Amino acid sequence: MLTFLIPTAKEMTTPKESHPHLLPQDSQAILKIMTAMTTEDLAKSYRIKEEAAKKEQQRWQDMASQQSLAYPAYQLFNGLMYRHIKRDKLTTQEQAYLTQQVYITSSFYGIIPANHPIAEHRHDFHTRIKIEGQSLKSYWRPCYNQFAKEHPQVISLLSSEFDDVFSKDCKQLWISPKFMAEKEGQFKTHSTISKKARGAFLTACMENNCQTVDSLKSLVFAGFYYHPDLSTDYEFVYIKKEA
């Protein structure tokens, strides 16, 4: 069985379905630090204006006082990649695929199933805090490595900020899809292409119920197709021709 890892997103939208918010034990130490930060501290940590930091501060305070609602993570996050993932009108098989084989890597919650209930928050591995004298990446590394050991065949749709959260020896069987546009024989990639394609790729995997590495090679989605000459055992390259 394939396991997919996807990142969080800064952009969020409030879904209709909500749940009580239950915070994992490992997240409690981070919450304690975040709620102790002033608006000015948060603005510096997030590199945002103080007005925006006030909103984030209120979210942390609501979490600490157990006033927050929680929403299925894959519905709450609404960045470019998430908007290209099929999230509505799923078949029973697609819903099972999404909730059992897709996991979200979070700097606040750890690694969670795609439908895990989470509260609105802003937090990533660029957030400048120390937990028990450790960086966020060092703090989460044991948890992340344990997940990798339990799920050796991972399809990683993660961005570069996650590269060194996992130890190298835990990623030996990982495959990282790469998405490129071809125009007049020239190949290019950029953030927008990659984010849209990650969502479309995951949707195609769900719709086709991909369960083997070889099945990924036959996928055609949003104009992309597998390119064997540019691919390696650990990096699958998908090309889209541009006019």
Curated annotation (Swiss-Prot):
InterPro entries: YaaA (IPR005583). It holds the Pfam family H2O2_YaaD. It comes from the Bacteria. GO terms for biological process: response to hydroperoxide. GO terms for cellular component: cytosol. NCBIfam families: PRK02101.1-4. Belongs to the UPF0246 family. This is UPF0246 protein SpyM51747. It comes from Streptococcus pyogenes serotype M5 (strain Manfredo).
